[in-house]
Structure formats: C-alpha cells, structure tokens
C-alpha cells in the first residue's frame, strides 16, 4: 500500500513537470515560455466555438429550420467577432508599442494573421453547408434561384419590377474628384461598379442595396416558393442607373467596421449619460473598416 501511494504521489507531483518540459504544442495551444501551462489563444478558441455552431447547421439530426438558424447565428457571431475582437487587434496594431497576448505570447499581428487563415477555412466550409441546406429546402418547396435559371419572360417580368418598385428608391453614386467616396455603413450591402466613360476614363460607381421599401427576398410570380435576392436584381439591371457609362465590372460588397471604441475620449462632464452614449454610438458607427 505504501509503495502504491508513493507511486501515486510521484505521478501527482512530478508528472506535470515532465509534461511541461516535453509538451511544446497541443492542438491550437501554444506554450508560453513564461507560463506553467499550455493555453489556446482566446480568439482561436472563440473561432472553434463558432465552428461548432456552424457544424450544427450541417448536423442531419437537427431539424432543417433549426439548422438554418444555426447558420444565421454563425454569420452574426462572425460579424460581431470582427467588429469587436479583430477591431481591438487592429487598434493595437496601429499603436507603436508591440502588444502581445499574455497567455500564448502571440502579437496582435500574429493573431490577426492566424485568425484570417482560420476564417478563410470556415467560409469555405460555410459555403458548402449553405449549398447543402439550399438543396434540402427544395423538396420543401423553397428555392433561391439566379438569373441564369430564369426564362426570358420571367427576366422581363423582373425588369418591370425593378423599374417600378426598386429603381425609384435607389441612390446611384459616382466616385470622382468632385465626388469623394461616400461613407459605407456597417454591415450594409452595396453594388460596386467599374465604369468607363465615353472618353475611355475609368470611374467607380456605388449603389446602396438596402431599402426599407422593397424586400430582400422577392418571389418569382410564375414560380411559387422560388425567390431571388433583391441585390442580384439590382446588379443585373444596374446599367439602367448609369446610361452614360459602360459597365466593365460589377460586384456586391459588404463592409464590417471596427466597433472597439475608447469611451474615455468621448467623456464630457457637461453631458449626461444618455447624451454620452449617443455620442459613443455615432462615433462607433464611423470607425475604420476591418473587413470587406
């Protein structure tokens, strides 16, 4: 019994020291030279959590409607992550002082680089799961389609819908010397165009795609349960908004802005708490972009 207890005591007190010397890396964990334990970086740990949320969207044992909800939660989480956590790291990178995370010793630059690599992998996975979900929605009578799958008659019908119900509420803009780049709101969709003038000069056009008047999902009248995105309709007929230009390239863009704001710089003794929070929100909505 005494010998057995001695062995247990040895394992309890000495084995961690042996493991400490031999353990260099475990999964995503990185050994900090000044630490007694092996840690996983906070940001990478959070991305692993969000990946588990995404995995639920692909889990066949979960009801389809809930899987769609999980996919939506994943995207919302990722937006908030970039706004707050990546925004904080971007702010640290802009400072002259080199700031390192105290658990793993990773600098702000190293964390951002690792985060972007992981997010690219997650976005590929998300696209695959999205296609899977869309395929499973078809037997339920719901389908998201694009212009390539529409007949000529249906395309003409959507063009009429664009002329009457979408175009009147759009505000097309052109970036030029006399017209600097407009402010792009956080998490909003924009149609971005490379335009060519009659003299051969290149200009950039921007069309905000969000509007409270028309819906984002528009049902095809001849196909009940078949929908098309309003931004795709805008992008398809956007040349009608720029009749004097030739459109060379076009795409949909979405900006995610930094939401990491220091309240001390906005504090004013003459303002009450409500006014101070209003100023904070206004300033927060106009911080620099962290993702496009």
Residue ranges of model-derived segments:
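Short, Lys/Arg-enriched N-terminal segments with co-localized hydrophobic residues
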Residues: 11-30
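Extended, highly charged clamp/arch subdomains and adjacent linkers
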Residues: 34-39, 44-66, 77-292
């Amino acid at each position: 019994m005494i010998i057995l207890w001695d062995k247990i005591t040895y394992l309890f007190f000495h084995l961690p020291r042996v493991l400490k010397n031999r353990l260099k890396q475990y999964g995503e964990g990185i050994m900090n030279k000044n630490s007694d334990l092996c840690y996983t970086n906070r940001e990478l740990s959070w991305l692993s959590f969000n990946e588990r949320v995404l995995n639920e969207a692909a889990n066949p044992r979960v009801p389809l409607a809930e899987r769609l909800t999980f996919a939506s939660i994943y995207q919302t989480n990722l937006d908030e992550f970039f706004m707050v956590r990546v925004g904080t790291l971007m702010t640290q990178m802009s400072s002259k002082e080199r700031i390192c995370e105290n658990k793993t010793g990773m600098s702000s630059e190293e964390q951002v680089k690792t985060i972007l690599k992981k997010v690219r992998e997650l976005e590929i996975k998300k696209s695959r799961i999205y296609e899977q979900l869309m395929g499973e929605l078809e037997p339920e009578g719901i389908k998201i389609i694009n212009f390539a799958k529409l007949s000529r008659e249906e395309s003409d019908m959507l063009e009429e819908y664009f002329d009457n119900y979408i175009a009147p509420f759009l505000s097309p803009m052109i970036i030029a010397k006399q017209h600097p780049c407009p402010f792009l709101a956080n998490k909003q969709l924009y149609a971005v165009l490379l335009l060519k003038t009659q003299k051969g000069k290149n200009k950039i056009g921007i069309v905000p795609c969000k509007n409270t008047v028309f819906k984002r999902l528009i049902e095809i009248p001849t196909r009940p349960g078949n929908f098309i995105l309003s931004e795709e309709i805008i992008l398809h007929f956007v040349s009608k908004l720029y009749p004097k230009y030739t459109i060379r390239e076009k795409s949909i863009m979405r900006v995610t802005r930094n939401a990491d704001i220091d309240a001390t710089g906005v504090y004013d003794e003459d303002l009450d708490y409500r006014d101070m929070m209003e100023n904070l929100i206004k300033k927060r909505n106009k911080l620099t972009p962290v993702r496009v």
